[in-house]
């Protein structure tokens, strides 16, 4: 399996990193774009969040198409179209065009993350899926950090060739998605039997290992699993987690700017929580695997996030507030690694695609609700204290729902 991991996971991690850059770069653009096109905090929040509404609407259809046409073609299509639309964000001139482009971008990206999660089930036996998921999810906080380091310098191109700096930012940061989409189209393979870098006996063994658990469930049992109350709880856990995550991440540059930092300082300071989270999430996942335990790690991660956001809101604009946000970020990303390692998504065929997409799509509604709540509760467009308290409440609610899930013995094991 080491050969499979080294062949697939670096590319998947890079794809996911670029995806996360694309999702958060609008928060850095907002430092100057909001003024240039006349957006207040509430209007920006609506535009930043509407991305997730279209993501939600198109996610399940996108994942079902992926199951039919294959990962190579469909993931490449997703990356190329989101790259084109992300670059087109440079053309927005006001609230209406900003909303339209953000909606189209969400529709283009729909199915990407659950598609990768589903792809893992095509290549990795059950005993390897948790670590495989953790390894490529590690790139999520790094994508946020890289976005800050790249975006703010690009904002300084203001006036070059008659364009605003944020316009250059959107154009430049669309290129990696376009290029990677072409790479995926050329090198990614859908199933083990299609590759030449595995020996014949290795291909046959791997196909047996990944197909056995898929065939162990009847279609009726699979659909029943998707619709039961435990699946609903998973969706709500991910929803409330994402409300806290995106409510903070899509406003972090504005929060830091409101604390008196220059744009250059914001670009550096905004990377700190995400670099910290990347390291912390790896340690958290390692400890979870060491203990062979998931639920308490998920609960503890969300309680840590709730505490960090509460302390940050209480402290206001200070260095210690950034430290508290960093603690919260560790919990938010650690939760995701453990959450996606739970086994109920290991179904087969179209049911597997629908199950993964349904939980992720419902969860991604939090990407709309969280930022919108933070935006409309901002006092004077610069004081986000109320929003941080509310996001802390979302994290605490996610922990409570996770405890209920554990009591229901969702995984029926010591996971």
What is the role of each PLM region?
Residues 57-96:
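Conserved MFS/SLC helix-loop-helix module at the cytosolic interface between two early adjacent transmembrane helices
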Residues 38, 70, 91-97, 108, ...:
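Helix-breaking motifs and short loop linkers at transmembrane-helix boundaries and internal kinks
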Residues 7-41, 147, 248-253, 370:
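Extracytoplasmic
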Residues 292-342:
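C-terminal transmembrane helical hairpin of 12-TM major facilitator-type secondary transporters
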Residues 67-79, 289-302:
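Cytoplasmic membrane-interface "Motif A"-like loop-to-helix N-cap segments
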Residues 101-138:
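Cytoplasmic helix-loop-helix junction between adjacent transmembrane helices
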Residues 26-27, 226-281, 336, 340:
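Extracytoplasmic gate region of multi-pass secondary transporters
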Residues 131-152, 176-177, 360-370:
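Glycine-rich segments within core transmembrane alpha-helices of 12-TM secondary carriers
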